[in-house]
A protein has these predicted regions:
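Structured soluble/peripheral alpha/beta segments that form catalytic or ligand/cofactor-binding pockets
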Residues: 1-396
C-alpha cells in the first residue's frame, strides 16, 4: 500500500458546522504505541492533541484557558485558531502527564491553499498540516501524495528535568488497506448539534525519541463535536498482523454528576449502555466486522500485582465483549498507568460543568475471537497493544 486512502478533503478544516457556544470542540489526536523492552507485555505510548474550543473560558487540568480570538477561516479554507497542544508520554513504567500543555495560535491549511509549498506538487489530494505558531516545531501533517503523516513534539522543560525525553518525531506510513483507509462519520441531530469524525485506525510508525528510533503503530483521528459530552468507555487494540479492534460504549450513569478526577466513586456503581458499537479489521480473515452490540465491565485490580496510577489510585481492569451474527470477541485487559485530563467549564447562573477524561495504556491478559472458522486466542499473536478511555461528568 503506497499511500493512505480515503477522502481527506475536510481533514484540515473545522468549519463543517456552525460553532455553538460552550459546545463546539475540535481536535486532532494521535496515539503512538511502541514496544517496551523492559516489560514486553506492555507498550510505551505517546499521545498528542491539538485542540480548540468555542468557549469564553475553560480550566484544563488546573490551567485556565481563555481564548483570545474565535476561529478565523479565510477564503481559501485555511484556519487560524486559539488553542492548546497537549501531550503525555508513558515509558512503560512512569506516566509523564502533561508532557506538554501549551497555549498557542495554530494555523491549518490543506494542499490547495496558497500557503502550501509550491514545490510539494501533487496538490488536491488532501495533504495538509496544523502548525502551532510557536518557537518549537509542534506540527502535525500529511505529506504530498498522502504517503505518510508526520508529527514533531518538544517536551516541557520541567518534564525533561523529571526524566522524560525531550524531542519526539514520528513518521506514520500505511499498514494495509482496511485500517489505513480513512473512515468518515458525520451526524447532525438538530439545532446544529452533532459530530464530524474522521479516523485512520492503524498505521505503521517510526518513532524517534531523542535520537533513538523504534518501530510501532499509530492511530489518528480528527474530531468536531457539538453536543454535551456524556460518560463513555472507548478503547482500541493493534495486533502484530495489522489487525485493529475497537469498542465504544457511551452510557447513562450517576457518574455524570461527578465533579473531580478521583476514581472509584460510589456514583459510578451502575451504567446503562447507550448504543454500544465496535469494529474489527481482521487481517487473518481479510475482512471487517462491524459490531452493534458491546458490553464493558470495570473492576479494580486486586492482589500483590495490582498496579496504581501516579496518584496512588488502584488502576482498573476492563472486560469487553463485542459481537454480531458471525463473530464474537471477548477481551480482558488491565491498565498499566493512567493519564487524566480534567475540564471545568463555567456555564449559566454561576454553575460549572465538569468532565474527567482518563486514558489508560493497556496490558492484554486474555482475548478470545470466535467465528465460523474457529477460535483464536492471545497465543495466536506475537503482540497486541492498546489503550482504553473512561470518561465521567458532563461538559456543557
Amino acid at each position: 500500500m503506497e499511500k493512505i486512502e480515503g477522502d481527506f478533503s475536510k481533514f484540515w478544516r473545522f468549519d463543517v458546522l456552525p460553532p455553538i457556544n460552550r459546545l463546539s470542540w475540535w481536535w486532532w489526536w494521535v496515539l503512538v504505541l511502541v514496544p517496551d523492552p523492559i516489560h514486553p507485555e506492555r507498550s510505551r505510548q505517546l499521545m498528542v492533541l491539538w485542540s480548540s474550543k468555542e468557549t469564553p473560558a475553560i480550566r484544563v487540568s488546573g490551567h485556565w484557558w481563555i481564548p483570545k480570538a474565535r476561529m478565523y477561516v479565510d477564503e481559501e479554507g485555511g484556519s487560524v485558531m486559539s488553542g492548546m497542544v497537549c501531550a503525555w508520554w508513558y515509558d512503560g513504567n512512569k506516566m509523564f502527564e502533561p508532557l506538554l500543555m501549551k497555549e498557542c495560535r495554530m494555523a491549518s491549511v490543506d494542499d490547495k491553499h496558497p500557503l502550501w509549498p509550491v514545490e510539494a506538487k501533487e496538490t488536491g489530494m488532501g495533504a495538509g498540516a496544523v502548525v502551532p505558531l510557536t518557537s518549537e516545531d509542534l506540527s502535525f501533517g500529511l505529506r504530498p501524495g498522502r504517503r505518510s503523516f508526520w508529527l514533531n513534539l518538544t517536551s516541557d522543560q520541567e518534564k525533561v528535568m523529571e526524566g522524560s525525553p525531550k524531542d519526539f518525531s514520528v513518521e506514520m506510513t500505511p499498514w494495509w488497506e482496511r485500517p489505513s483507509t480513512a473512515k468518515y462519520k458525520n451526524n447532525v441531530f438538530g439545532l446544529n448539534m452533532g459530530y464530524d469524525i474522521q479516523r485512520v485506525h492503524g498505521m505503521k510508525a517510526k518513532l524517534n525519541i531523542d535520537g533513538e528510533e523504534v518501530e510501532g503503530s499509530a492511530y489518528i483521528q480528527k474530531v468536531g463535536v457539538q453536543a454535551p459530552s456524556l460518560p463513555w468507555f472507548w478503547g482500541m487494540l493493534h495486533f502484530d498482523d495489522g489487525s485493529y479492534l475497537d469498542w465504544f460504549m457511551p452510557h447513562v450513569s450517576p457518574s455524570f454528576t461527578m465533579k473531580d478526577d478521583t476514581p472509584w466513586s460510589m456514583r459510578d456503581f451502575f451504567r446503562t449502555p447507550n448504543a454500544g458499537s465496535g469494529i474489527f479489521h481482521d487481517a487473518n480473515r481479510n475482512r471487517t466486522e462491524n459490531f452493534k452490540r458491546c458490553t464493558v465491565e470495570l473492576e479494580r485490580q486486586e492482589g500483590e500485582n495490582a498496579l496504581r496510577d501516579e496518584q496512588g489510585n488502584l488502576l482498573p481492569r476492563f472486560k469487553i465483549k463485542v459481537w454480531n451474527g458471525r463473530t464474537q470477541v471477548s477481551i480482558h485487559v488491565r491498565a498499566t498507568s493512567r493519564a487524566r485530563w480534567v475540564f471545568d467549564q463555567p456555564t449559566r447562573a454561576g454553575f460549572v460543568s465538569h468532565l474527567t477524561y482518563n486514558e489508560y495504556p493497556l496490558e492484554i491478559e486474555k482475548i478470545a475471537i470466535l467465528d465460523e472458522q474457529g477460535l483464536r486466542s492471545i497465543d495466536d499473536y506475537e503482540w497486541i497493544r492498546g489503550n482504553a478511555e473512561h470518561a465521567w461528568g458532563i461538559l456543557n
